[in-house]
A protein has these predicted regions:
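Short N-terminal helix-initiation segments at or just after the protein's N-terminus
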Residues: 71-75, 209-214, 234
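Catalytic cysteine-centered active-site loop
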Residues: 211-212, 219, 230, 251-260
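N-terminal accessory/pre-domain segments preceding catalytic cores
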Residues: 2-188, 275-276, 311-320
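Hydrophobic/aromatic-rich core segments of domains that either
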Residues: 235-313, 317-320
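Secondary-structure boundary elements
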Residues: 163-227, 276, 284-285, 290-296, ...
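Active-site nucleophilic cysteine motif
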Residues: 192-196, 229-244
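A broad, low-specificity signal for short, low-complexity segments enriched in glycine/proline
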Residues: 42-47, 92, 212-215, 224-231
Length: 320
């Protein structure tokens, strides 16, 4: 009997220890459940819309310059995504090539007046070659200048915010003023993009005669396009790009193919979305591609909007 009492007492003690352990564990769980941890809400990136407009101005600051008797390259602002080149020789027809290792070679016409022109470093960081060529005859050229550059762009949007040879504007441009007018009262990027898009497709008409007669080397004059309210695809895209860039929205003027046609369109960077290729308008349900030429000349028919809405119809080659 005495032995039985001792065993019973031992079991009760063990039960007490186990029960106490359970009570301790449960108390710990309750304490953990009731403890407070501060978790901040995720911040939504906000668009800082400029008052009126904001135009970045390229400058040939002379800090980093390469030159010979034929050409001068100012590479002082490669970190901002652009270079400036001028020709100082005597030949009338000049070409510039800007190429990054492993990427497309960008070929431009260069004026022969001895003034700088701006060229974007569209392909991002890496090793570039900048070459200037003088025309001999026909399509034959001789190299007049060559320089390699190691580029490290600190502002990845720089190439698509600054004006350049293809998208040429300044603070006094009528296109910039119109962009500010269209964007007044709008607070977000989508609103700005939509306002500019709607204006262009509703007020510009496709210039068929110009499309049939345009020559190689043609560069859009965005203020002329705005005043005449007509143009080719290149004009549409350049005008919208200028307006959007002046509203601090990174915008690419893209040249490539739609089917077998050589064509131009634009892409924008939207905070919270990233680069939106060929898209400008959200109707509450679907994004619409950003190509303003087809939307305008097609009068926004169901068929043309379906074509524009299929990104597979677009093959980008160059971005300016």
């Amino acid at each position: 009997m005495e032995r039985t009492k001792k065993i019973t007492a031992a079991l009760l003690a063990a039960a007490t220890v186990i029960t106490s352990g359970q009570a301790f564990l449960m108390t710990g769980l309750v304490a953990q459940q009731n403890s407070r941890t501060t978790i901040e809400d995720t911040q939504v990136p906000l668009y800082s819309k400029p008052a009126g407009s904001h135009v970045l101005t390229p400058i040939a600051s002379g800090v980093t310059v390469y030159k010979n008797d034929k050409a001068t390259l100012d590479a002082s602002n490669t970190a901002s995504g652009y270079i400036m080149v001028k020709y100082t020789g005597s030949v009338g027809k000049i070409k510039v090539q800007v190429s990054k290792s492993g990427s497309e070679t960008y070929t431009y016409d260069l004026n022969s007046s001895g003034t700088y022109e701006v060229f974007p470093l569209s392909e991002g960081n890496g090793s570039y070659q900048v070459k200037v060529f003088e025309n001999i005859q026909g399509t034959q050229y001789s190299q007049a200048f060559s320089q390699s550059l190691d580029v490290n762009i600190t502002d990845t949007f720089g190439p698509f915010l600054y004006p350049n040879q293809y998208v040429n504007f300044n603070p006094a441009s009528a296109a910039v003023q119109k962009g500010a007018e269209l964007s007044s009262g709008v607070t977000d990027q989508i609103g700005v993009v939509t306002a500019i898009y709607n204006y262009v497709i509703n007020n510009l008409t496709y210039d068929t005669a110009k499309a049939q007669s345009v020559q190689s080397g043609y560069l859009p004059n965005v203020d002329v396009v705005l005043a005449q309210k007509k143009g080719i695809c290149f004009d549409y895209a350049a005008l919208m790009t200028a307006m959007l860039r002046s509203q601090d929205i990174p915008t690419k003027l893209v040249v490539g193919y739609t089917g077998s046609l050589y064509h131009a369109w634009i892409n924008v960077f939207l905070e919270g979305q990233g680069w939106v290729d060929n898209v400008i308008y959200f109707d509450g349900h679907d994004w619409k591609l950003m190509d303003p030429t087809f939307a305008s000349s097609g009068k926004q028919s169901k068929e043309i909007m379906q074509y524009i809405g299929n990104g597979g119809n677009y093959k980008a080659k160059y971005s300016y």
